[in-house]
Amino acid sequence: MNTFGRELRITTFGESHGRAIGVVIDGVPAGLPLTEEDIRKELDRRMFCHIHWLNPRCEPEEFEILSGVKDGHTQGTPIAIVIWNKKAISSYYDELWMKPRPGHADLAYYLKYGKFYDHRGGGRASGRTTAAIVAAGAVAKKLLALVGAEVAGHIVELGGVEVKRPYTFEDVKKSWEKPLPVVDDDALAAMLEVLRKNAAEGDSVGGGVEIWAVGVPQGLGEPHFGKIRADLAHAAFSVPAVVALDWGAGRQLAKMRGSEANDPIVVKGGKPGLETNKIGGVLGGITIGEPLYFRVWLKPTPSVRKPQRTVDLAKMEPATLQFKGRYDVSVVPKALVALEAMTAITLADHLLRAGVIRRDRPLKDPVV
């Protein structure tokens, strides 16, 4: 389906080369300050137009808030946001019809929808559609701010180049002042060179990002079906190109003995907390007031300019294709912004589920 969430529900729509993409957000309380600038700020973070290899389409996001907002505040009714597609060049995809691109969703969509699916630009499976997710994430981040919570992410690996130096949450936020959100300047320089090299060779690279959520209240999540980690994993895998997820110290925990893996419980400001937080802020599927953090791994962009083997579905014969359209050398930076958004949406949904934020009455104005 195309809807995510329980109390805060988002429904996305549209295809890469259709007239528009968009999102309907239901469950936002009345009285939340929200402007077009709030949406634009997040959409602009997704662009990376200053690095041509990451966004050759570089489409300025022309959007409209169609409903649910009046005089700079939400009304408590569904918020509809439409984002217009302006720079699609569909002719690039004429020769690809009935020749599924390896690594793309083309084959799966053909098997499920037959000849009725829109293959242009990847259609519904395109990374372009994550712009709608990012727009919804802008609203969710405003909800998180009501309780003093914030979400931020950064790139930890790109094309085999890894960030190895230690860092803080403040370092993660400041990394967005750089060409790419990378806390290590040496790693950043190497990543930019990897992007340049692969663009010249007509290839692509994958990588990994890390998402942080700080200030999240304790008690969110359920013991079994509705665990906060399970819901966040569901959210993460809703973003195109995601192939794996590590929570907290992740696979490193699996290599430790129990005495090493356990986080000592200590008193922090008169309350119980964790001394080390290798577990990533969640125990038993429930938040405990510590920072949440997890890493998400993404495959390389399937569209490359190198010849690839496929099948001509009309003839059921082997075929070779070579993509000639525009493509991102790496989906990692744009996916990072979408993953931030899905994290914020999931946490805001849990805040509403738990009654931390109520929607049976207007929020105070101004919001505190």
UniProtKB/Swiss-Prot annotation:
This reaction introduces a second double bond into the aromatic ring system. It comes from Pyrobaculum arsenaticum (strain DSM 13514 / JCM 11321 / PZ6). It catalyses: 5-O-(1-carboxyvinyl)-3-phosphoshikimate = chorismate + phosphate. InterPro entries: Chorismate_synth (IPR000453), Chorismate_synth_AroC_sf (IPR035904), Chorismate_synthase_CS (IPR020541). It comes from the Archaea. Belongs to the chorismate synthase family. GO terms for molecular function: chorismate synthase activity; FMN binding. Its cofactor is FMNH2. This is Chorismate synthase. The gene is aroC. It is an enzyme of class 4 (lyase). Transmembrane segments: none annotated.
